[in-house]
């Protein structure tokens, strides 16, 4: 199943195709739980390989919790034997996003997670 949700100035661009889930842009909408609920269901129902690519510029507190919920799903799928990994890209000078990525990594117990610093 292929899914594409275009982003806005407050919502991230989401794409999901052939086991690759990508989230880029900014995430600071009013009701993060409502926005992420169908994405959570999509990940829960997905079978097989699941590679996550994160490239966020900004993430508010409620979006952060929703993203963590999504990544816990990926972690559980990895433990169940699925081919899963997470790649988090952030701008080389964005210490806040780097710190957020490292905090997420510390909370995830199993799934491999790599970081990529990118130029502006």
Task: For the regions a language model picked out, list residue spans one by one.
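STAS-typified acidic loop motif
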Residues: 1-37
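Extended lipid/amphipathic-ligand handling interfaces
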Residues: 43
């Amino acid at each position: 199943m292929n899914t594409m949700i275009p982003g806005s100035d407050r919502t991230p661009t989401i794409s999901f195709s052939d086991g690759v889930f990508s989230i880029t842009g900014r995430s600071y909408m009013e009701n993060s739980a409502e926005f992420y609920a169908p994405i959570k269901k999509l990940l829960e129902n997905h079978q097989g390989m699941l590679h996550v690519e994160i490239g966020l510029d900004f993430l508010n507190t409620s979006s952060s919790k929703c993203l963590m919920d999504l990544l816990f799903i990926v972690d559980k799928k990895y433990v169940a034997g699925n081919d899963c990994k997470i790649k988090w890209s952030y701008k080389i000078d964005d210490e806040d996003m780097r710190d957020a990525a490292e905090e997420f990594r510390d909370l995830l117990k199993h799934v491999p997670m790599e970081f990529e610093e990118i130029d502006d």
